[in-house]
Amino acid sequence: MAYRKRGARRETNLKQDERMQEKEDSKNINNDSPKSQLSEKVLSKKEEIITDNQEEVKISDEVKKSNKEESKQLLEVLKTKEEHQKEVQYEILQKTIPTFEPKESILKKLEDIKPEQAKKQTKLFRIFEPKQLPIYRANGERELRNRWYWKLKRDTLPDGDYDVREYFLNLYDQVLMEMPDYLLLKDMAVENKNSRDAGKVVDSETAAICDAIFQDEETEGAVRRFIAEMRQRVQADRNVVNYPSILHPIDHAFNGYFLQHQLVEPLNNDIIFNYIPERIRNDVNYILNMDRNLPSTARYIRPNLLQDRLNLHDNFESLWDTITTSNYILARSVVPDLKELVSTEAQIQKMSQDLQLEALTIQSETQFLTGINSQAANDCFKTLIAAMLSQRTMSLDFVTTNYMSLISGMWLLTVIPNDMFIRESLVACQLAIINTIVYPAFGMQRMHYRNGDPQTPFQIAEQQIQNFQVANWLHFVNYNQFRQVVIDGVLNQVLNDNIRNGHVVNQLMEALMQLSRQQFPTMPVDYKRSIQRGILLLSNRLGQLVDLTRLLSYNYETLMACITMNMQHVQTLTTEKLQLTSVTSLCMLIGNATVIPSPQTLFHYYNVNVNFHSNYNERINDAVAIITAANRLNLYQKKMKSIVEDFLKRLQIFDVARVPDDQMYRLRDRLRLLPVEIRRLDIFNLIAMNMEQIERASDKIAQGVIIAYRDMQLERDEMYGYVNIARNLDGFQQINLEELMRSGDYAQITNMLLNNQPVALVGALPFITDSSVISLIAKLDATVFAQIVKLRKVDTLKPILYKINSDSNDFYLVANYDWIPTSTTKVYKQVPQQFDFRASMHMLTSNLTFTVYSDLLAFVSADTVEPINAVAFDNMRIMNEL
């Protein structure tokens, strides 16, 4: 990256500390030294570098040669000169622009957003897995036999108040996160260890299931023979391969859908060629070549580059500020560094000659030289381009008495559209230019500007100034706005053609020359000369300023071609600070070396923009789908804020905790209006149609609960032993949990319970399992009764399933004493689907082979012409001043 090394910054700080120390020392020696001869003594043409050691040597030599009085005088003179020189050096150092410190973390987050297809699929998507469960005898003892059932692979319900609907919403979210863009079965296939002829099955989980079934003593011989025959079937002429898989019917439906709706598309050279931004393809400064012909099996996933459907620039100040900040940091990392700048020392010396500072006694013109250094110039160049690329608002820092800064500011306001500056800063700068340079030149009274005036100072001045050239320049600045142009479907903010070709600088120079010829009738002659000399310094570099303007425009437009999201211009909450002394540095130190972005930098910038934009759209699609699902699951109010928070977290760059609530809810409202993407909708429908099967396979979700005032005996069950479970609801009066929750009318159920009538609440609800006999004796099941009778709530209902068998603690209490345990509740739970090998064996079909390429620009080799020969849009060299 193009940032200065940290070591260099430390060295600068050390030097600064040394100079401060030296300044303090010299002040202690002589506090009352006169400062009237600053311009004479400090900026003499002869350069001296004085260190502490040299100072001591010089002083000791002079003392030896002279008597005591002379030595005292000489010591004072040397110290005075030394102090003045150090003071000016320190002032210059203080006025330099500090090196821009990149927020490395934001840049890394942006660059780490990779396209999803980079995650290689190694297994099929599964919700279910077959599990071997024991069988229990009538007395609760475990048999040696086992039976296979389909159970949930991830059977997790978080603790606390939790609704089964939320489980399904989380399951849907999990499916969306894992939903593959493509499936290539050949890549995930593994060897079937039990195969006779080294056949393969579709994935490692299928192989593990086959192994477990093959080794199970109760497996039929026919099934073992079938497993030994399981292998892939290849149809090479059709580029198709079939793999055997063991899947639950619902999982088979999911994977079948993924295979049918893959997002991969054929890839060829034309697609790669058209993927490169058109303006870079057509830019004569870049030489692009395709390295190779692609095979017929090459595939790619088209990035999702829909324009911003949420309009984040509209009423989302915090979010917009974060996006523009991250774009600004990214843009700064790709703006090229200026090369071969004019030597700072040589330029300051030349400027001091032009100003004839040694002949002057006024102090104002020494300020012209403060803050001029190459680091500030480079920093200013990068700030201007990066701020325009990211549409970050800038604020200006300046000192009104530094006329050189204000004259440089006139160039800045000429080439950068007014919208880029925060209004308060723009008004302050324009007012300073009017009252310091323009109005005094014509002998006009100071402008008294009213805060809140809809017109800017330049707009007021344009109407009052009679001079044609000055009024013409003011008119240009007042109407200098970005042109909004849609290129390749992206809204671009384009600069005025007069700025792009640099002609506007001539217009500025005409206005400046007119100002320098005026008499400044109300001002002293020294004031007039100072302004004239400042204008002279800038006008001496007319050619370089034209080149600088063209260079700025070219780099901005070339990098702008790599932006994929609409460039919306809205003032940002925070601003990027720009000091006018750094603009002076840029104007005074710009050389004649052309710098243009390298092709690798452009491709990197383009890829990062595409990846962020594509990820942004995919996350929007996910959030819209989750909101729709939450609505259909009646969780709309409960889950909404967390859905929006998850959406922002997955965009990587946001600090979600700091986003104001009003913007969260506005974001929710905008997401709610968007249509659901068809693939995501189909996936939700698959889950919604099979909710009962998923509930049955869970060890934590029941289909209802039976409540009685009197104890009910625990029953024997093959799957659990002694258990308070009901497999059907025959003979019980049923109340729907959904309706009870909706109506809030608990009178019916309370009356039934108090009249000793058992009642069945039907609906999916979570339950917990307890296998301790002691806990069954120790407590009544208040978890249900209290919720119903006292709290009048069913949304936090969580019954306990008591499971007593030979695996339980203290089982001997039941076995030895023929005790019949009882409970006041029964959990209504249907039997999970039994695993049937024949019904679970599916053949899945996919392409035999294809290769997905995620980085299309890797096939393009690119180079540039010699920078000195680089041309702008008008087919003339960018930098003409050689």
Curated annotation (Swiss-Prot):
It holds the Pfam family Rota_VP2. The keyword Nucleus does not apply. The record marks 222, 226, 230, 841, 843 as: Interaction with the intermediate capsid protein VP6. It is found in: Virion. Residues 1-45 are annotated as: Disordered. It comes from the Viruses. Keywords: Capsid protein, Inner capsid protein, Repeat, RNA-binding, T=2 icosahedral capsid protein, Ubl conjugation, Virion. One of its GO terms (molecular function) is RNA binding. Residues 9-27 have a biased composition (Basic and acidic residues). Residues 28-39 have a biased composition (Polar residues). Residues 396-416, 424-444 are annotated as: Hydrophobic. Homodecamer; each decamer is made up of two conformers of VP2, called VP2A and VP2B. Interacts with a VP1-VP3 complex. Interacts with the intermediate capsid protein VP6. Interacts with NSP5. Interacts (via N-terminus) with NSP2. The N-terminus binds RNA. It is necessary for encapsidation of VP1 and VP3. The N-termini of 10 VP2 molecules form a cylindrical hub underneath each 5-fold axis of the inner capsid. This is Inner capsid protein VP2. It comes from Rotavirus A (strain RVA/SA11-Ramig/G3P[X]).
